[in-house]
Regions:
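A structural-propensity feature for long, helix-poor, extended segments
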Residues: 116-137
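Structural signature of FAD isoalloxazine-binding scaffolds in flavoprotein oxidoreductases
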Residues: 100-117, 132
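Beta-hairpin (beta-strand-turn-beta-strand) motif
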Residues: 87-90, 110, 126
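Residue-level detector of alpha-helical recognition elements and their boundaries
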Residues: 30, 107-108, 122
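Structural motif
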Residues: 12, 21-22, 111-113, 120, ...
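Generic secretory/membrane-interface signal
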Residues: 63, 74, 113, 127-129
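N-terminal non-catalytic cap/leader segment that marks the start of a structured domain
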Residues: 1-104
């Protein structure tokens, strides 16, 4: 099951993504009396029980939002920490003519470094160069 956070009327919502679109969990819960975690954090804390409750909700509510029309929020909207691994792609090390490190190169970022879907990325006026890099979250 794939989950997402998205914005609806300025409010952060939990969604479940399937082949038909995105189930708005908050809206679905307002149409039922089921006890289902209403945030990704609560869902993770609930473990398998929360997962089975969400599967039941998904089966009972057929209304979906079109995925392409949503404005997605970061998967974890308010992380305590953001730990990053640098130089983890061979192409990135060769681009800078560097040897691949033997041990992971770790660095941190502040939570305000997150940008939601279709949000502008703020660039410091002191920045001299920007470089793209794909980020993975596990």
């Amino acid at each position: 099951m794939r989950y997402c956070h998205f914005f609806s009327a300025g409010e952060l919502r939990l969604g479940v993504v399937d082949e038909c679109g995105v189930l708005d969990v908050t809206a679905a819960l307002s149409r039922t009396r089921m006890a289902v975690p209403d945030s990704l954090e609560a869902l993770m804390r609930a473990g398998e029980k929360g997962q089975s409750q969400m599967e039941r909700l998904l089966r009972t509510d057929s209304y979906r939002l079109p995925a392409e029309e949503l404005r997605y929020a970061p998967a974890v909207p308010h992380p305590e920490k953001i730990l990053c691994v640098g130089l983890n792609y061979t192409t990135h090390t060769t681009e800078f003519d560097m040897e691949r490190p033997r041990e992971p190169v770790l660095f941190g970022k502040f939570s305000n470094a997150l940008a939601a879907h279709r949000e502008d990325i703020s660039v410091s006026r002191y920045a001299r160069k920007l470089d793209y890099e794909a980020e993975l979250v596990v």
